[in-house]
Amino acid sequence: MKKATLVIGVIGADCHAVGNKVLDRVFSNHDFRVINLGVMVSQDEYIDAAIETGADAIVVSSIYGHGDIDCLGMRERCIERGLGDILLYVGGNLVVGKHDFADVETKFKEMGFDRVFAPSHDLEDVCQLMAHDINQRHDVDTRILEEAI
């Protein structure tokens, strides 16, 4: 069976590399194929890599607190580039200052992200949730294909 492919990186002007390396290791150890773009990644770089690799999901990290600015319009850009149905995940310290995480989560979901993870979210759970989402997406795609045949 084909491994699910994740495009990961740290968005915008954020140069926090350590967490990104941790994510790469954890995701790889959970049998994901990881395309790690590193730090200071633009929206278009994520999308280009997702197109080139046939990725199942894009995982955006932001630690410096400007994720809300850097991620604005990402779903729309995915749609424009033909990836309207790609799974979009975001996590980290996404906004400057202290905010109730429920408000942050709502904001990013309204921006088109499928799941939003707080900095303290357990990575085992993140892996399970992503695997579930990807498997569910593949099951739907398979049923649609079978119905079309």
Swiss-Prot record:
The keyword Calcium belongs to this UniProt entry's keyword annotation: no
Which InterPro entries does the UniProt entry name for this protein? Cobalamin-bd, Cobalamin-bd_sf, GlmS
Coiled-coil ranges per the record? none
Q: What is its EC number?
A: 5.4.99.1
Tell me the cofactors it needs.
adenosylcob(III)alamin
In what residue span(s) does the B12-binding domain sit? Answer: 3-140
Q: Name one Pfam family in it.
A: B12-binding
What domain of life does the UniProt record list for this protein's source?
A: Bacteria
Q: Name one GO molecular function term.
A: metal ion binding
Q: Which reaction does it catalyse?
A: (2S,3S)-3-methyl-L-aspartate = L-glutamate
The UniProt annotation places adenosylcob(III)alamin binding at 13-17, 61-63, 93-97
Cite the annotated pathway.
Amino-acid degradation; L-glutamate degradation via mesaconate pathway; acetate and pyruvate from L-glutamate: step 1/4
Q: Would I find Metal-binding among this entry's keywords?
A: yes
Which parts pass through the membrane? none
According to its UniProt record, this protein's enzyme class is: isomerase
Assembly and partners are described as:
Heterotetramer composed of 2 epsilon subunits (GlmE) and 2 sigma subunits (GlmS). GlmE exists as a homodimer and GlmS as a monomer.
NCBIfam families documented for this protein = MthylAspMutase, PRK02261.1
Record-given protein name:
Glutamate mutase sigma subunit
Q: Which organism is it from?
A: Escherichia coli O157:H7
Gene it is expressed from: glmS
